[in-house]
Amino acid sequence: MDLTTTRQRRPLISDSSSSSSTKSYSKTDKPGRSNGGDAEDGGLRWFLPFIALCYLRYMSATSNIIHDCDEVFNYWEPLHYILYKSGFQTWEYSSNFALRSYLYILFHELAGRPASWWFGDDKVRVFYAVRLFLGLVSAVSDTVLVVALSRKYGKRIATYAVAMLCLTSGCFFASTSFLPSSFSMYAISLSSGLLLFEKYAMAVAVSVVGVILGWPFSILAFLPVVIYSLVKRFKQAFIAGAVTTIFLLGVSLLVDYYYYKRWTSSVLNLLIYNVLGGGESHLYGTEGALFYIRNGFNNFNFCFILAMLFVAIYPVIRRKYDRALLVVISPMYIWLAFMSLQPHKEERFLYPIYPLICVSASAVIENIPELFREKYSSRESLLVTITKYMRPVILGCILCASHSRTFALINGYSAPLEVYKLLEHHDDAGPGSVLCVGSEWHRYPSSFFVPHYISEVRWIDDGFRGLLPFPFNNTLGGTSASPPYFNNKNQASEEQYLKNIETCTFLIELQLSRPYQYRGSDLSTWEAIAVLPYLDRELSPAKYRSFFIPHMWQEKNVFGKYVALRRVPK
């Protein structure tokens, strides 16, 4: 029988060349990660970013200074009152005005109440327990954002982002600050991450929480995420937003009634006062249009500059990223422009967009080589190769400058917290002791640092003519009181200062090189029980005080003395 074998022809080179596309290929033609993600590794795992963020948030919680007296008097003090039935009240918490939400304070009681049971009279530990709680919330929200970035756009942009979220000075300090703007920052991170995960209903719900429970004015920063989510999944996103809004406004209304003892909404009161009621924020200081640009550079150095460039290079890199990343980053520009137009400016007002600055800068750093790539060439130029290796160098410079800035602030301005901690070692003064504070009232670190043997903290007149906080008046009703000495014009009350300084047992002073005498200079009346250096901002050159450079920082700057004094027994 004849066997017929069929031999298959070996493919020729010309066959393969003819079947392939004639169009040249370059790396810029690769589909972006937004078209399906990395099938091999699925992006970063949850564990490592979370651990890194938790570690840095722990460091922030334990070493962060208090940057603003508003944090103390409008948030730490009401929490102290809820926990211990003593603390200072500002005019915003007067029942007559009711501008502050107790629901936001109660959220922090979730950590403060168990800590007060566990640590008893050690209120300083309760303070740091609340800070650790804030750090944990920040770490969780930032982890969601980082993992979402990695799964949608790749590990590199996510790695850059987590490094800057951990170490940039702005994020380091804002992450554990007890402020509504910090809470809105957590919500911005979480809602942005959920949007990238395509969890649109959850993104809208978190946005509502950030606005109502956190800072109502931050609604402008959440608009891009909310609008994009509604476009993508209108029904689910709308229902989630509506239900969350109704629920939180209802709960807030009930909580406000419980504490203010009248039907009122602190959320609406705050908006009406500032938007419709002619809120006179200029009474508390005004700044120029470039304030936030300078502030952004101080807190993020070159990261801030790179972040601002994202919109400029987006036309070059838009094939790599889908529209979702532009939506996530856009609140940075909207918020910065809007806040720069307001006369009253505070550093904390920029907190909500801090994570977006890191994301934007990460995208720019990742794509620096793309700016130098030849469009139709498949070969990589020397300049592209060099810029690839420059990316970690740029990131390293940002992180080193950030660490230097963080270290400068902690070493320069941590004295108030540390000096007040030492008061607990002088309980031999006995119950009923009075702690007096003059011009340093705005650096008062909160009643959590005042030992139980001190019965009163009193302000003494050092020339300040604005309205100071008063202790919550339990006789008039505590949180429901409308004391007559409060006003919304920042006008000093005759009752706010202690008349007889002879009743002071302890005195807190900042002694700087100025041509006048300090009360603590009278050594026959006062003895120093704690003295720590404090950076003299006015006499220290900006180029040396802003960033910590070993040896030079100590030599070129001028320091005063932050002093706790005790009355000499007669």
Swiss-Prot record:
It is a multi-pass membrane protein. Glycans are attached at residue 473. The chain crosses the membrane at residues 129-149, 160-180, 208-228, 237-257, 297-317, 324-344, 349-369, 381-401. GO terms for cellular component: endoplasmic reticulum; endoplasmic reticulum membrane. In the absence of ALG9 activity, the N-glycans transferred to proteins are aberrant, indicating that the oligosaccharyltransferase (OST) complex is substrate-tolerant. Residues 14-25 have a biased composition (Low complexity). Mannosyltransferase that operates in the biosynthetic pathway of dolichol-linked oligosaccharides, the glycan precursors employed in protein asparagine (N)-glycosylation. The assembly of dolichol-linked oligosaccharides begins on the cytosolic side of the endoplasmic reticulum membrane and finishes in its lumen. The sequential addition of sugars to dolichol pyrophosphate produces dolichol-linked oligosaccharides containing fourteen sugars, including two GlcNAcs, nine mannoses and three glucoses. The keyword Membrane applies. It is an enzyme of class 2 (transferase). Residues 1-37 are annotated as: Disordered. Its EC number is 2.4.1.259, 2.4.1.261. PANTHER family: ALPHA-1,2-MANNOSYLTRANSFERASE ALG9, GLYCOSYLTRANSFERASE. It is found in: Endoplasmic reticulum membrane. It holds the Pfam family Glyco_transf_22. The keyword Endoplasmic reticulum applies. One of its GO terms (molecular function) is kinase activity. It catalyses: an alpha-D-Man-(1->2)-alpha-D-Man-(1->2)-alpha-D-Man-(1->3)-[alpha-D-Man-(1->3)-alpha-D-Man-(1->6)]-beta-D-Man-(1->4)-beta-D-GlcNAc-(1->4)-alpha-D-GlcNAc-diphospho-di-trans,poly-cis-dolichol + a di-trans,poly-cis-dolichyl beta-D-mannosyl phosphate = an alpha-D-Man-(1->2)-alpha-D-Man-(1->2)-alpha-D-Man-(1->3)-[alpha-D-Man-(1->2)-alpha-D-Man-(1->3)-alpha-D-Man-(1->6)]-beta-D-Man-(1->4)-beta-D-GlcNAc-(1->4)-alpha-D-GlcNAc-diphospho-di-trans,poly-cis-dolichol + a di-trans,poly-cis-dolichyl phosphate + H(+); an alpha-D-Man-(1->2)-alpha-D-Man-(1->2)-alpha-D-Man-(1->3)-[alpha-D-Man-(1->2)-alpha-D-Man-(1->3)-[alpha-D-Man-(1->6)]-alpha-D-Man-(1->6)]-beta-D-Man-(1->4)-beta-D-GlcNAc-(1->4)-alpha-D-GlcNAc-diphospho-di-trans,poly-cis-dolichol + a di-trans,poly-cis-dolichyl beta-D-mannosyl phosphate = an alpha-D-Man-(1->2)-alpha-D-Man-(1->2)-alpha-D-Man-(1->3)-[alpha-D-Man-(1->2)-alpha-D-Man-(1->3)-[alpha-D-Man-(1->2)-alpha-D-Man-(1->6)]-alpha-D-Man-(1->6)]-beta-D-Man-(1->4)-beta-D-GlcNAc-(1->4)-alpha-D-GlcNAc-diphospho-di-trans,poly-cis-dolichol + a di-trans,poly-cis-dolichyl phosphate + H(+). Belongs to the glycosyltransferase 22 family. It comes from the Eukaryota. This is Alpha-1,2-mannosyltransferase ALG9.
